[in-house]
Amino acid sequence: MTSLHTVSLAELAHRFKTDLTHLEQVSALYPCRISSYYAGLITAPYDPVWKQCVPSVEECDDTVQLPDPLDEERLSPVPGLIHRYPDRAVLLVSNRCATYCRFCMRKRKVGCSGGATDLPAACDYIAATPQLRDIILSGGDPLMLPDDELHQILSDLRRIPHVEIIRIGSRIPVTNPSRITPGLCRMLAEHHPLYLNTHFNHPMELTPEAARAC
Protein backbone atom coordinates (compact mmCIF):
# COMPACT_ATOMS: atom_id res chain seq x y z
CA MET A 1 0.00 0.00 0.00
CA THR A 2 1.38 3.42 -0.94
CA SER A 3 1.86 6.03 1.79
CA LEU A 4 -0.53 8.97 1.87
CA HIS A 5 0.87 12.50 1.87
CA THR A 6 -1.47 15.25 2.99
CA VAL A 7 -1.58 19.05 3.00
CA SER A 8 -2.68 21.04 6.04
CA LEU A 9 -4.90 24.11 6.09
CA ALA A 10 -1.86 26.12 7.17
CA GLU A 11 0.01 24.98 4.07
CA LEU A 12 -2.93 25.90 1.86
CA ALA A 13 -3.17 29.29 3.54
CA HIS A 14 0.52 29.91 2.87
CA ARG A 15 0.26 28.75 -0.74
CA PHE A 16 -2.69 30.99 -1.56
CA LYS A 17 -1.78 33.81 0.87
CA THR A 18 -5.10 33.70 2.66
CA ASP A 19 -6.17 33.41 6.30
CA LEU A 20 -7.90 30.14 7.16
CA THR A 21 -7.64 30.26 10.96
CA HIS A 22 -11.40 30.81 11.22
CA LEU A 23 -11.90 27.29 9.86
CA GLU A 24 -10.22 25.62 12.83
CA GLN A 25 -13.57 25.45 14.66
CA VAL A 26 -15.01 23.52 11.72
CA SER A 27 -12.16 21.04 11.43
CA ALA A 28 -12.34 20.47 15.20
CA LEU A 29 -15.90 19.23 14.71
CA TYR A 30 -15.52 17.63 11.28
CA PRO A 31 -11.89 16.68 10.61
CA CYS A 32 -10.06 17.97 7.56
CA ARG A 33 -7.76 15.86 5.42
CA ILE A 34 -6.59 16.72 1.91
CA SER A 35 -4.23 14.49 -0.03
CA SER A 36 -1.24 16.26 -1.57
CA TYR A 37 -2.36 15.02 -4.97
CA TYR A 38 -5.87 16.46 -4.61
CA ALA A 39 -4.58 19.72 -3.14
CA GLY A 40 -2.42 20.02 -6.24
CA LEU A 41 -5.57 20.28 -8.35
CA ILE A 42 -6.63 23.50 -6.61
CA THR A 43 -5.91 26.54 -8.76
CA ALA A 44 -7.45 29.28 -6.60
CA PRO A 45 -9.37 29.71 -3.34
CA TYR A 46 -13.00 28.64 -3.67
CA ASP A 47 -12.54 26.92 -7.01
CA PRO A 48 -14.51 23.67 -7.54
CA VAL A 49 -11.83 21.44 -6.00
CA TRP A 50 -11.28 23.77 -3.04
CA LYS A 51 -14.99 23.79 -2.24
CA GLN A 52 -15.05 20.00 -2.06
CA CYS A 53 -12.20 19.61 0.42
CA VAL A 54 -11.62 22.82 2.39
CA PRO A 55 -13.98 23.35 5.36
CA SER A 56 -16.51 26.16 5.42
CA VAL A 57 -18.21 27.76 8.42
CA GLU A 58 -21.60 26.80 7.00
CA GLU A 59 -20.89 23.21 8.04
CA CYS A 60 -21.48 24.25 11.66
CA ASP A 61 -24.87 25.83 10.95
CA ASP A 62 -27.34 23.55 12.74
CA THR A 63 -30.30 25.21 11.02
CA VAL A 64 -29.35 23.67 7.67
CA GLN A 65 -27.24 20.65 8.68
CA LEU A 66 -28.21 17.26 10.10
CA PRO A 67 -25.62 14.95 11.71
CA ASP A 68 -27.26 11.86 10.19
CA PRO A 69 -29.16 13.12 7.13
CA LEU A 70 -30.00 9.64 5.82
CA ASP A 71 -31.13 8.29 9.20
CA GLU A 72 -28.52 5.53 8.97
CA GLU A 73 -28.08 4.96 12.70
CA ARG A 74 -31.69 3.82 13.00
CA LEU A 75 -31.15 1.40 10.12
CA SER A 76 -28.07 -0.28 11.61
CA PRO A 77 -28.93 -3.71 13.06
CA VAL A 78 -25.29 -4.12 14.13
CA PRO A 79 -22.57 -1.44 14.37
CA GLY A 80 -21.32 -0.45 10.94
CA LEU A 81 -23.96 -2.22 8.83
CA ILE A 82 -26.78 -0.23 7.23
CA HIS A 83 -29.75 -2.28 6.03
CA ARG A 84 -32.08 0.17 4.30
CA TYR A 85 -33.43 -1.90 1.39
CA PRO A 86 -34.53 -5.55 1.60
CA ASP A 87 -31.93 -7.11 -0.71
CA ARG A 88 -28.85 -4.95 -0.09
CA ALA A 89 -26.81 -3.46 2.74
CA VAL A 90 -23.91 -1.08 3.23
CA LEU A 91 -20.94 -2.32 5.24
CA LEU A 92 -18.74 0.44 6.65
CA VAL A 93 -15.22 -1.01 6.66
CA SER A 94 -13.16 2.15 7.21
CA ASN A 95 -13.61 5.55 8.81
CA ARG A 96 -10.80 7.20 6.84
CA CYS A 97 -10.49 8.67 3.36
CA ALA A 98 -7.59 10.09 1.39
CA THR A 99 -9.48 13.39 1.31
CA TYR A 100 -12.45 14.25 3.49
CA CYS A 101 -15.16 15.60 1.20
CA ARG A 102 -17.00 18.45 2.87
CA PHE A 103 -20.33 17.26 1.46
CA CYS A 104 -19.97 13.82 3.06
CA MET A 105 -23.21 12.41 4.43
CA ARG A 106 -21.19 10.47 7.06
CA LYS A 107 -18.91 13.26 8.24
CA ARG A 108 -20.09 12.50 11.79
CA LYS A 109 -18.05 9.28 11.52
CA VAL A 110 -15.24 9.90 9.05
CA GLY A 111 -11.91 10.72 10.64
CA CYS A 112 -13.36 10.40 14.14
CA SER A 113 -12.64 7.85 16.84
CA GLY A 114 -15.30 5.49 18.14
CA GLY A 115 -18.21 3.80 16.41
CA ALA A 116 -16.10 1.04 14.91
CA THR A 117 -17.76 -1.58 12.74
CA ASP A 118 -18.17 -5.01 14.33
CA LEU A 119 -17.12 -6.99 11.25
CA PRO A 120 -17.78 -10.49 12.68
CA ALA A 121 -21.25 -9.43 13.84
CA ALA A 122 -21.93 -7.77 10.49
CA CYS A 123 -20.95 -10.92 8.57
CA ASP A 124 -23.06 -13.03 10.93
CA TYR A 125 -26.05 -10.76 10.27
CA ILE A 126 -25.54 -10.95 6.51
CA ALA A 127 -25.19 -14.74 6.65
CA ALA A 128 -28.40 -14.99 8.69
CA THR A 129 -30.36 -12.74 6.31
CA PRO A 130 -30.81 -14.69 3.06
CA GLN A 131 -32.57 -11.88 1.20
CA LEU A 132 -29.32 -9.88 1.26
CA ARG A 133 -27.75 -10.47 -2.15
CA ASP A 134 -25.90 -7.16 -2.68
CA ILE A 135 -23.28 -5.79 -0.25
CA ILE A 136 -21.71 -2.37 -0.73
CA LEU A 137 -18.41 -1.73 1.04
CA SER A 138 -18.18 1.89 2.08
CA GLY A 139 -16.93 4.00 4.93
CA GLY A 140 -14.86 6.12 4.89
CA ASP A 141 -13.10 4.65 1.91
CA PRO A 142 -12.54 0.88 1.70
CA LEU A 143 -9.41 1.38 -0.42
CA MET A 144 -7.74 3.08 2.55
CA LEU A 145 -7.41 -0.39 4.05
CA PRO A 146 -4.23 -2.40 3.49
CA ASP A 147 -4.61 -4.96 0.70
CA ASP A 148 -4.55 -7.91 3.10
CA GLU A 149 -7.33 -6.49 5.30
CA LEU A 150 -9.55 -5.75 2.32
CA HIS A 151 -8.80 -9.22 0.92
CA GLN A 152 -9.96 -10.80 4.19
CA ILE A 153 -13.24 -8.86 4.21
CA LEU A 154 -13.96 -9.79 0.60
CA SER A 155 -13.13 -13.43 1.31
CA ASP A 156 -15.49 -13.50 4.29
CA LEU A 157 -18.31 -12.09 2.18
CA ARG A 158 -17.62 -14.49 -0.70
CA ARG A 159 -18.13 -17.41 1.67
CA ILE A 160 -21.77 -16.39 2.19
CA PRO A 161 -23.71 -18.29 -0.51
CA HIS A 162 -26.54 -15.81 -1.05
CA VAL A 163 -24.24 -12.79 -1.52
CA GLU A 164 -24.22 -12.41 -5.30
CA ILE A 165 -22.95 -8.85 -5.73
CA ILE A 166 -20.14 -7.04 -3.92
CA ARG A 167 -19.55 -3.37 -4.64
CA ILE A 168 -16.85 -1.02 -3.38
CA GLY A 169 -17.64 2.67 -3.10
CA SER A 170 -14.44 4.70 -3.38
CA ARG A 171 -13.20 8.18 -4.27
CA ILE A 172 -9.57 7.00 -4.23
CA PRO A 173 -9.30 7.12 -8.06
CA VAL A 174 -10.20 10.81 -7.76
CA THR A 175 -8.33 11.86 -4.62
CA ASN A 176 -5.28 9.56 -4.47
CA PRO A 177 -4.98 7.59 -7.72
CA SER A 178 -1.50 6.25 -6.89
CA ARG A 179 -3.23 3.91 -4.42
CA ILE A 180 -4.52 1.90 -7.40
CA THR A 181 -1.47 -0.34 -7.68
CA PRO A 182 -0.93 -3.54 -9.69
CA GLY A 183 -0.93 -5.46 -6.42
CA LEU A 184 -4.30 -4.04 -5.40
CA CYS A 185 -5.75 -4.82 -8.82
CA ARG A 186 -4.49 -8.41 -8.68
CA MET A 187 -6.05 -8.88 -5.26
CA LEU A 188 -9.39 -7.43 -6.36
CA ALA A 189 -9.36 -9.66 -9.45
CA GLU A 190 -9.37 -12.70 -7.15
CA HIS A 191 -12.87 -11.73 -6.01
CA HIS A 192 -14.60 -11.15 -9.34
CA PRO A 193 -17.35 -10.40 -10.06
CA LEU A 194 -16.64 -7.21 -8.15
CA TYR A 195 -17.82 -3.69 -8.90
CA LEU A 196 -16.09 -0.42 -7.99
CA ASN A 197 -18.31 2.65 -7.87
CA THR A 198 -16.60 6.02 -7.94
CA HIS A 199 -17.67 9.54 -8.82
CA PHE A 200 -16.00 12.57 -10.31
CA ASN A 201 -17.70 15.86 -9.53
CA HIS A 202 -15.87 18.29 -11.82
CA PRO A 203 -13.74 18.21 -15.00
CA MET A 204 -10.77 19.50 -12.97
CA GLU A 205 -10.61 16.05 -11.38
CA LEU A 206 -10.22 14.29 -14.73
CA THR A 207 -6.44 14.08 -14.80
CA PRO A 208 -4.13 11.61 -16.60
CA GLU A 209 -3.34 10.04 -13.21
CA ALA A 210 -7.03 9.48 -12.49
CA ALA A 211 -7.57 8.06 -15.97
CA ARG A 212 -4.76 5.54 -15.46
CA ALA A 213 -6.20 4.54 -12.09
CA CYS A 214 -9.56 3.83 -13.66
Regions found by a protein language model. Give the residues of each.
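Conserved aromatic-histidine-acidic binding/catalytic patches
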Residues: 26, 89, 141-142
